[in-house]
């Protein structure tokens, strides 16, 4: 079996051969299904929908028998619900084999084992289900965009091939809502970075960006960070119960009235689903500030942000229109009178960078403290900058005598050439490799930033570039940052820990076998450290930041290890980790920026942070012992957590 892995020394993607006994359960553990299973609002609403429709069908069918088809059964939870609510036969489909095996074990050890059959196939590949068609289809095949996991085809083909006439579907219908907003914050995740911050700058020409969804926990956006310009607009209405009404490609012009003047910088999106068509049982994805009475946190579905191809100004009380489009798998929105087809990036920036990285570059261009330090370090000097996709060299050009940008990514070099031409930066050159820098620079600068990095410490690739440069140009070559520090802090999240929590008994069903295989997989490997945008998740820090490893940027890369205790864990449920860099006279943090008097952390929105969730055996300890090993040969950091002697 082959697995893709990123070489942390070079940034290259490599294929490695897994051991013959590689356990796919490890993939199951890393997939973090726990949050979905522990979504009690979801579970209760599906249960209510099943209860209603099973009762209706039992009354309606002459023999009083009901066959339920569960598509994408996961642990088998919805199948168990259907059987307990009186379904006479349940056929459960699950294409992901480790999950299907898990469901088969759980259902076969339940009181309803004689009613439930688990089939490890995709619903669109199945031609018959146990000799009789379904009276009810239940499926949780949704994502942030509602239809992104193929819900439309799943329901349409199942109704056509696997269901009886009049088959009920749980859920029955769905609505998608959009709200146009003005927001400087959300602009930063999409706007092409402008070196001087002027609105009329177009260093990469005009580009509408990409129509791709930007999924985000909108509940953690502060209300002062955006301004709603109208009431929510119903963009789409989906009927999942009637195959003839399920259409893959549609376009609608929706009207709204502006309740204040402003510019539509972004569209906020969420959806709801009616579980039984009775209009009383909904799963509502509205964010917390819009849905105070019915809000339920979840991470397996989120809200989303979309951007119009062109920003649109509206005046108070003006009626305006937005074109709402969808195909089989995705949604997009466009301006009236313009091409309604999906917009694509033509500048190269949006197609290469994540929304988070676009924000990072825009934030860097706005960070006056950082720009002042770059100006001071660069003044009158030959500056070399290293990284992959780092815009630092463009900032250094303001005061430097000469700037050499070293970037191995050809597409980024093309983008930088466009910036150089647009801003007439005659003192900037670009080369591909650190070994091509033949003239000794006065100083080497880096953020450090490498686009291929998955977490903050993957930017330690910078150490290897500096090692080569110092071998070529001497140990006296000045480098900033001159120190990197890996840090950690205990935190109690309100909800994020659910993605790694044990599920145990859910709605009266024993799902502990899922915990057994997940825990076994997690403990058999290095500690699983997730990458998360922590600004999207509410929590309170419960102690001081702890230094784990220090990395002097002196040109000598060496393996190192440490053992450190993380205290106050009995009141915490996670350990966030991040890198800080000592850059000249300032500190650059990829993670924690500040802590309020109430203990609320502010996290850097331009990076993902690492976060470790203690396994069950460690969750009640007052202190955890962290063993961290930086391996020079691979550029990786391996983490192991265990009981502290102080616990």
UniProtKB/Swiss-Prot annotation:
InterPro entries: Arg_MeTrfase, MeTrfase_PRMT7, PRMT_dom, SAM-dependent_MTases_sf. It holds the Pfam family PRMT_C. Its EC number is 2.1.1.-. It comes from the Eukaryota. Keywords: Methyltransferase, Repeat, S-adenosyl-L-methionine, Transferase. PANTHER family: PROTEIN ARGININE N-METHYLTRANSFERASE, PROTEIN ARGININE N-METHYLTRANSFERASE 7. Arginine methyltransferase that can both catalyze the formation of omega-N monomethylarginine (MMA) and symmetrical dimethylarginine (sDMA). This is Protein arginine N-methyltransferase 7. It comes from Caenorhabditis elegans.
């Amino acid at each position: 079996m082959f697995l893709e892995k990123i070489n942390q020394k070079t940034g290259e993607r490599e294929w490695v051969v897994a051991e013959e006994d590689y356990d796919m359960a490890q993939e199951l553990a890393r997939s973090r299904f726990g949050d979905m299973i522990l979504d009690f609002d979801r579970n209760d609403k599906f249960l209510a929908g099943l209860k209603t429709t099973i009762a209706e069908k039992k009354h309606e069918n002459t023999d009083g028998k009901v066959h339920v088809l569960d598509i994408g059964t996961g642990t088998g939870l919805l199948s168990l619900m259907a059987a307990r609510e009186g379904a006479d036969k349940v056929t459960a489909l699950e294409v992901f084999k480790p999950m299907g095996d898990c469901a088969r074990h759980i259902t076969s050890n339940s009181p309803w084992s004689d009613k439930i059959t688990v089939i490890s196939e995709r619903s669109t590949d199945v031609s018959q289900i146990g000799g009789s068609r379904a009276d009810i289809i239940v499926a949780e095949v949704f994502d942030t965009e509602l239809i992104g996991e193929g819900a439309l085809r799943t329901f349409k083909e199942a109704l056509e091939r696997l269901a009886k006439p009049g088959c009920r579907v749980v859920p029955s219908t769905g609505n998608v809502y959009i709200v146009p907003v003005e927001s400087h914050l959300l602009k930063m995740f999409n706007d092409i970075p402008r070196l001087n911050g002027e609105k009329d700058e177009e260093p990469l020409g005009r580009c509408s960006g990409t129509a791709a969804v930007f999924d985000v926990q909108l509940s953690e956006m502060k209300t002062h960070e955006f301004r709603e310009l109208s009431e929510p607009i119903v963009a789409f209405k989906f009927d999942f119960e009637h195959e003839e009404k399920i259409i893959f490609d549609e376009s609608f012009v929706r009207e709204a009235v502006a309740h204040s003047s402003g510019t539509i910088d972004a569209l906020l999106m969420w959806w709801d689903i009616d579980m039984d068509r009775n209009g009383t049982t909904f799963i509502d994805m509205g964010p917390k500030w819009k849905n105070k009475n019915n809000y339920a946190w979840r991470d397996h579905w989120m809200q989303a942000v979309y951007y119009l191809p062109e920003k649109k100004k509206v005046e108070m009380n003006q009626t305006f229109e937005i074109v709402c489009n969808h195909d089989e798998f995705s949604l997009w929105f466009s301006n009236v009178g313009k091409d309604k087809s999906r917009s694509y990036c033509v500048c190269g920036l949006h197609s290469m960078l994540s929304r988070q990285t676009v924000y990072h570059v825009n934030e860097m261009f706005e960070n006056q403290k950082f720009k002042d330090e770059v100006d001071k370090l660069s003044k009158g000097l030959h500056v070399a900058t290293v990284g992959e996709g780092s815009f630092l060299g463009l900032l250094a050009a303001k005061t430097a005598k000469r700037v050499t940008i070293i970037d191995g990514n050809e597409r980024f070099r093309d983008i930088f050439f466009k910036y150089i031409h647009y801003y007439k930066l005659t003192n900037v050159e670009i080369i591909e490799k650190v070994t091509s820098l033949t003239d000794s620079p006065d100083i080497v600068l880096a953020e450090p930033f490498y686009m291929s990095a998955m977490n903050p410490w993957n930017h330690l690739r910078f150490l290897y570039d500096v090692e080569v440069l110092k071998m070529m140009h001497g140990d006296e070559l000045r480098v900033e940052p001159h120190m990197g520090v890996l840090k950690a802090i205990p935190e109690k999240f309100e909800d994020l820990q659910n993605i790694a929590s044990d599920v145990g008994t859910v709605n009266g069903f024993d799902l502990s076998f899922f915990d057994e295989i997940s825990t076994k997989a997690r403990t058999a490997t290095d500690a699983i450290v997730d990458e998360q945008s922590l600004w999207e998740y509410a929590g309170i820090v419960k102690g001081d930041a702890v230094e784990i490893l220090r990395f002097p940027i002196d040109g000598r890369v060496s393996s190192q290890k440490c053992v450190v205790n993380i205290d106050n864990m009995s009141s915490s449920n996670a350990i966030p980790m991040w890198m800080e860099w000592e850059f000249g006279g300032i500190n650059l943090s990829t993670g924690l920026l500040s802590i309020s008097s109430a203990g609320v952390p502010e996290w850097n929105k331009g990076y993902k942070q690492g976060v470790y969730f203690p396994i069950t055996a460690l969750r009640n300890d007052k202190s955890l012992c962290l063993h961290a090993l930086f391996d020079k040969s691979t550029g990786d950091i391996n983490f192991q957590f265990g009981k502290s002697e102080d616990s």
